[in-house]
C-alpha cells in the first residue's frame, strides 16, 4: 500500500509532528508500506531514509508555496491509497478534491488559536477561544481548521480532551479516534536531588518547547527570581527557540538571572537526553497542550513533574496523582509566586515526590509506551 504523509515541520525542525512522522514512516516502511512524506523546510537537505521525503522551502511567496505544495500532493498522492495529514491541512484537502483518496487526519492542537496568540490578537485560554467570537481573520481561521477536519475519513487525536474539542468543530464521534502519544521506555534512572546536601548539589530545573506566548516561559523565569531567595544552587534550562526568545533573554537579564537561567536553543533528541539526565524537576506552565510528549520524556528520565492542568496534560498528571499541579489565573497563565511555592513544596516533600514519580512511571508503562501506541496507528492503516 502507498501512503502519502503531509506535515508542516520535519527534522531538523523540533516539535510533536516532527518527532512523530519519522517514527510512523519508519514503522510503516518496515511493514511493507510505500511511504512518501511532503514537508516544509528551511533549507534543502538530502534525506537518507528508506522512505521518500519531498521538501518544500518554507520561506517563499506564500501563494507560490501553496500552489507548489498542492501540486506536489496531487503528484505524489495520485498512486497513494491513503493521505495521512499531520500538517498542511488546507493544501491537503484542496489536493484531495482532485485525488479523492482516503484521508486520515491527526490533530494535535488548534492552529487558529496559536496564530491568534502569536500575533497578539487574543489573550484567552484555549478552551475559551473555542466558544468566543473573534474578528473576521480569526473566524475564517476557525472555520478553516474545523471544516477541513470534517472532510477527513478519520481524525486521530492524542488526548480525550482534544477529541472533545474536535467533535465541537463538527467532526462526528464515529470518525474520531484517540491514540495517545508515547515515549520509548528505557531504564534511565538518574540520581534524585537530595535537599539535605544542597551545599554540594545544584538543583536543575528544565522546560522544553517552542518559546511561544502560550508556553508562559516568562512565568517560570519570574518564579526563579523568587526561588533564589531560599535556594542558592540551582539552574533552569530553557530548551527550544521561538518568537519570544529575545524577550525572555531580556527578562532574564533584567532580573539578574543570567547565571541561573540557561537558554540552550534547539537540541536534537540525543542532545536533549543529557539535559533530562542532569535535571531533577520538569516545569510546564503552558496555557494549553494537546498531550505534551516532553512530559512523557521527563517521566522516563525520573524527573518530578510540575504542570498546569490543561488539555491532555491532565491525562498525564491525573489530577495530581503523578505530579504537582499549578493552576492558571483567568485561564491564561500561572502566578509566578504560586509556582515558586509549589517548587519549594516539591523540594521539601521527598516521600510525596517519590510516590508521585513511581505513579508516573507506572502510568508510562501502561498507557504511554511508544512502541505499543505506534502499533495502534499501524492497525489503522492495515484496516
Please describe what each predicted stretch is.
Residues 4-6, 156, 197-215, 220-224, ...:
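Conserved donor-binding/catalytic core segment of Leloir-type glycosyltransferases
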Residues 104-143:
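Acceptor-binding helix/loop patch of EC 2.4 sugar-transfer enzymes
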Residues 287:
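Aromatic "clamp/platform" in nucleotide-sugar-dependent glycosyltransferases that forms part
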Residues 77, 149, 266-267, 274-279:
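Short alpha-helical donor nucleotide-sugar binding micro-motif in glycosyltransferases
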Residues 304-307, 317:
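Short hydrophobic beta-strand element within catalytic cores of glycosyltransferases
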Residues 71-78, 127-155:
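Membrane-proximal helix-turn-helix segments that form the acceptor-binding/catalytic region
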Residues 249-267:
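Nucleotide-activated donor-binding/catalytic signature segment of Leloir-type glycosyltransferases, i.e.
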Amino acid at each position: 500500500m502507498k501512503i502519502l504523509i503531509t506535515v508542516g515541520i520535519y527534522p531538523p525542525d523540533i516539535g510533536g509532528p516532527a518527532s512523530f512522522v519519522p517514527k510512523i514512516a519508519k514503522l510503516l516502511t518496515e511493514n511493507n508500506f510505500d511511504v512518501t512524506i511532503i514537508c516544509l523546510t528551511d533549507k534543502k537537505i538530502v534525506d537518507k531514509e528508506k522512505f521518500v521525503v519531498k521538501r518544500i522551502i518554507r520561506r517563499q511567496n506564500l501563494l507560490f508555496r501553496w500552489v507548489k505544495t498542492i501540486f506536489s500532493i496531487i503528484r505524489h498522492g495520485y498512486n497513494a491509497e491513503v493521505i495521512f495529514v499531520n500538517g498542511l491541512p488546507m493544501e491537503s484537502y484542496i489536493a484531495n478534491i482532485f485525488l479523492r483518496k482516503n484521508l486520515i487526519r491527526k490533530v494535535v492542537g488548534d492552529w487558529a488559536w496559536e496564530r491568534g496568540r502569536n500575533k497578539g490578537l487574543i489573550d484567552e485560554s484555549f478552551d475559551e477561544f473555542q466558544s468566543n467570537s473573534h474578528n473576521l481573520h480569526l473566524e475564517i481561521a476557525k472555520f478553516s481548521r474545523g471544516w477541513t477536519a470534517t472532510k477527513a475519513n478519520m481524525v486521530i487525536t492524542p488526548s480525550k480532551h482534544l477529541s472533545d474539542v474536535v467533535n465541537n468543530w463538527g467532526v462526528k464521534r464515529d470518525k474520531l479516534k484517540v491514540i495517545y502519544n508515547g515515549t520509548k521506555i528505557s531504564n534511565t534512572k538518574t540520581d534524585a536531588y537530595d535537599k539535605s546536601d544542597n551545599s554540594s548539589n545544584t538543583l536543575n530545573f528544565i522546560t522544553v518547547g517552542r518559546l511561544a506566548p502560550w508556553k508562559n516561559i516568562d512565568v517560570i523565569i519570574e518564579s526563579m527570581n523568587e526561588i533564589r531567595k531560599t535556594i542558592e544552587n540551582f539552574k533552569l534550562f530553557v530548551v527550544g527557540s521561538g518568537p519570544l526568545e529575545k524577550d525572555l533573554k531580556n527578562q532574564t537579564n533584567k532580573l539578574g538571572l543570567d547565571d541561573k537561567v540557561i537558554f540552550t536553543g534547539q537540541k536534537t533528541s540525543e542532545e536533549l537526553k543529557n539535559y533530562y539526565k542532569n535535571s531533577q524537576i520538569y516545569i510546564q506552565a503552558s496555557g494549553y497542550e494537546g498531550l505534551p510528549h516532553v512530559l512523557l520524556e521527563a517521566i522516563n528520565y525520573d524527573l518530578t513533574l510540575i504542570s498546569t492542568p490543561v488539555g491532555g496534560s491532565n491525562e498525564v498528571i491525573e489530577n495530581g496523582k503523578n505530579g504537582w499541579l499549578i493552576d492558571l489565573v483567568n485561564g491564561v497563565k500561572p502566578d509566578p509566586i504560586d509556582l515558586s511555592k509549589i517548587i519549594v513544596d516539591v523540594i521539601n516533600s521527598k516521600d510525596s515526590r517519590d510516590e508521585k514519580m513511581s505513579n508516573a512511571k507506572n502510568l508510562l508503562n501502561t498507557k504511554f509506551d511508544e512502541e505499543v501506541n505506534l502499533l495502534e496507528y499501524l492497525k489503522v492503516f492495515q484496516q
